[in-house]
Amino acid sequence: PCYSSDVIKLQLVEAGLVECLLEIVQKTVDSDKEEDISELKTASDLMVLLLLGDESMQKLFEGGKGSVFQRVLSWIPSNSHQLQLAGALAIANFARNDGNCIHMVDNGIVQKLMDLLDRHVEDGNVTVQHAALSALRNLAIPVVNKAKMLSAGVAEAVLKFLRSEMPPVQFKLLGTLRMLIDAQAEAAEQLGKNVKLVERLVEWCEAKDHAGVMGESNRLLSALIRHSKSKDVIRTIVQSGGIKHLVTMATSEHVIMQNEALVALALIAALELVTAEKDLENAQLVQILHRLLSDDRSAPEIKYNSMVLICALIGSEPLQKEVQSMAFLEVVSKLRSHENKTVAQQASLTEQRLAVES
């Protein structure tokens, strides 16, 4: 019990286990014998397991110069599905810190992973697809990698899997796109105008059996708006029926998702209120905002963004009528004495706006 499993992993690496495993892989990779195939699987699985420890992973990476890292790279273009899988999982594990990710992208790993994905678009090998997408998602986290990966065509490569009916693949696909467009306005606009993608997102927002896919679809819808700030993107999302999902997302139990939804909705209200008006009304946004502002448990940023949104919604006649009918002034004036200064300030501004409008 005194040993953490990370310590054990590091000791196994230092004791030379990796070299033994690589030798087994070398010996069994071209064999069709059942026991060899099973040995290959065990050895490559163990290899991936050792990389789950932070120190053992960093030791084997050796700044990207490590012979082990190089050997694992050579698994990705291999003809063995088992080695392709282990190679992609190993890269996803090496890609757990920014330094490693930046080094790998600068040294051409992205093309190798895209080639691997290309080999599996049609055959539906879910485990390999999932592993390669996991690696790409992790590699896309550092800011400097995003533009490089976008210009290498990663978004297009990932979109080939939009047709997939497998939730694990859908989940990683969504996560990869969301990482790629973070603060990348042009890419967010391009993807946000892609009707096929947006329609698929709206469909997945209803995937009640797969909370992960549902959550990621909502977050990507919101991200497309937040990072593009584009009227065209908003129109595409309105036409595809995405507004109601963003309104529902504002009631999520996760503050980060609530906030992403409110910021996206505020952009919609600022840029395309007339287009979205009907959908916002039908989704009962005004009632939801009233609830968020009245609820003592709402986080300060939720209260702040809800008030910003109310100020924007007043620009629409039907929505303004709803705001007036719901006694917002009372709720907002209470927030003027909120302990959070930003919330209190926004409450004063909102109160003035509401008073003028009434």
For each predicted feature, which ranges?
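Intrinsically disordered, serine/threonine- and proline-rich low-complexity regions
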Residues: P1-L10, E23-I24
